[in-house]
A protein has these predicted regions:
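Cyclic nucleotide-binding regulatory module and flanking cytosolic helices
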Residues: 1-35, 45, 76-77
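Inter-domain helical "communication" segments and dimerization helices
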Residues: 2-6, 10, 31, 99, ...
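Short beta-strand segments in beta-sandwich/barrel cores
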Residues: 30, 38-39, 55-61, 96
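His/acidic/aromatic-lined binding-pocket segments of jelly-roll/cupin-type domains
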Residues: 30-32, 40-42, 46-52, 68-69, ...
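Glycine- and acidic-residue-biased ligand/ion/polar-headgroup-sensing regions
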Residues: 45-64, 73-74
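Cyclic-nucleotide recognition modules
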Residues: 64-121
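Polybasic "coupling" helices that flank or enter modular domains
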Residues: 116-175
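Phosphate-/nucleic-acid-contacting segments
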Residues: 152-210
Length: 210
């Protein structure tokens, strides 16, 4: 199945998250983080895992702040240590997050013998990363923009209401601002999408070619 047909899959949460959070975290582990808080996957030499039970976070690279996407609770992040240590989170809304040392998480997994649950979750997330990579390396600039619009329309209302469509796409792709603005203007002119003050309100129908 092509990425074009699977774009909606990227927003579907892992079916293994709820039992994973229940098994690993307790209420006292969670802290309330304000919007725009930044969390890293390493504290000194210690790798960390983040468990989000309320709110949404943006995942970005440390080196250039390139946005990899916005994810909403529930979330369990940090199991893939080599990859995670190059990333950070930024809360897009007030969020409840538990941050635990990776070694402590692995000790709990061993104690409760939930390796199968963790493996299934990691496989699910790995598949999402593969799909997202397909979206970012689509054949044409319009394909890339199209995928991002389909992602944006699925974001929570508060994110769509506070984020200009062009900025959302600019932060997550290597497309130029001018090409993004041109394609959005043409889509709006053709009544394919509805934009108000630059914010995406609706997608009526997206053509497969530009």
């Amino acid at each position: 199945m092509a990425a074009r047909d699977r774009h909606i899959d990227i927003k579907v949460p892992s079916p293994h998250l709820t039992p994973l959070l229940t098994a690993i975290t307790h209420d006292e582990d969670y802290r309330l983080w304000k919007k725009s808080s930044k969390l890293f996957f390493r504290r000194g030499a210690q790798p960390l895992c983040h468990f989000v039970r309320k709110g949404s976070v943006l995942i970005a690279r440390n080196e250039d702040a390139f946005s990899l996407g916005i994810l909403s609770a529930p979330l369990a992040l940090g199991f893939t240590v080599p990859l995670s240590e190059h990333l950070h989170l930024r809360t897009m809304a007030e969020s409840e997050i538990a941050t635990l040392p990776y070694e402590q998480v692995m000790a709990i997994v061993e104690e409760k013998q939930i390796w199968d649950l963790v493996a299934k979750h990691v496989m699910f997330v790995t598949n999402k990363i593969f799909i997202y990579n397909e979206m970012l390396t689509a054949p044409t600039s319009f394909d890339i923009l199209r995928y991002q619009l389909l992602m944006l329309i699925q974001e929570p209302d508060e994110i769509r209401a506070s984020t200009a469509a062009y900025q959302y796409i600019l932060d997550r792709t290597r497309l130029s601002r001018s090409s993004i603005m041109k394609m959005l203007a043409e889509l709006k002119k053709g009544h394919y999408i509805q934009l108000e003050n630059g914010k995406l309100q609706a997608i009526h129908h997206l053509p497969t070619r530009f």
